[in-house]
Amino acid sequence: MGVFQVKCRWSHTAPDDPIVAPGLPGASHRHEFFGNVSTNAHSTTSSLSGRDTTCARPRDKAAYWAPTLYNDGRRVEPNLMIAYYRTGPLRNPSIIRPYPLGLRMIAGDGLATKPQPKLVTHWSCADNGPNGTSDLPRSCAGVPLRLKLVFPNCWDGKNRDSADHKSHMTYSYRHDKRCPRSHPVAVPTLKMGLRYDIRGPLNRIRLASGSRFGAHADFWNAWAPDAQRELIRKCLLRAKTCNSPALPPRR
């Protein structure tokens, strides 16, 4: 399986969501933003494309965000986000195409009232991925808490977004590892990995979207098209692992 990684520092926090509540600052639950430093309720593909990023690959101008996590009522700032762009569960990875500029996607369900599918949301302690669960672990003894969210990898080929922000995308794992006729364009499988420095009992965790079950994340593609295309060619289509460059020192 091919993959290329991008490490991104936390950028900012705000009660904004340019996908679900565009043009309405303060209308959303609080989110933590990574990547593009300008992301806000008024963001557009054009406004994102010309701005700086907190990511280690400077031509990744995409916006990434997830709901704020609270521990015993206190906001916890995630100390790192790693984006993993993978070939994903596809019978024929050679058909993968770049994301169209301006594509918006959501992974997970912010209104969930029970654990979500492990293939979409996945909690673990540090890097014990296979031992993680779709619900929060009881405790992380001496290691950080991690949340991974997996985005859909089949696009309808027409719409950069949809009314419910989900119908234009679907998961190949739901269709026998193929992209269905309704969503024929295979794109990279994006997995966002968030790390929180919470060590100890996790029974007082909640997300800004509601309960602990509502883990979700949003993505707005503003990659430089040629940079994304080259990483897909070099890493995904050749089944290679391309690790993230190191993050530059903090200013």
Which residue stretches match the model-derived regions?
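Primary mode marks residue(s) on the alpha4-beta5-alpha5 output face of response regulator receiver
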Residues: 1-28, 32-149, 156-251
